[in-house]
Amino acid sequence: ALASEPGIKAIIDEGAFHGLDLASELELLPSFRDKALYVAITHPQVFQVAGTINHAHSLSRRYWRHRGNMPPREPDVSQAARDAFRDAISAYFRQNEGRGHRCTVDAYLRVNRYHYFFAYPDNYADTYLGHDEDGQFVRRPQRPAFEVVFLFDPIDGTLDVYAHGGKV
């Protein structure tokens, strides 16, 4: 997914945040695929975060909601604040939809301005039907996660939220 023009832009931006001049490092590589593979090998953390951010930018615009008039201040991204946010998201989905019993929240700062929060609450339980490594048929209960993305811009005071579902 990063072997594209937007993907390489995400890599270069993330590298700059970490004090790396990846534009210069990647300049002589002949293809997007070569550039992405080079970063995956030499700067795996940059590659991982750039992939996450690039993924957010490729999500369907249909499910994004925009809100202005947010307080123009830096959010609290401490572990305690992220834990409280995680618990609030989990509680919301448990109470309103009967899912979200567990949740993980990852936070990323992008180009020293944009705060991304990726929440992964549990979806409804299901059973995996398939074969294990020994070829034996198995039924395994599982709770896959679904994704909710929050993008906060403290300078403009805007919040964009991505949640796949019906129109609100």
Predicted regions and their residues:
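Intrinsically disordered, low-complexity polar/charged tails and linkers
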Residues: 1-142
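Broad gene-expression machinery/nucleic-acid interaction feature
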Residues: 114-116, 147, 158
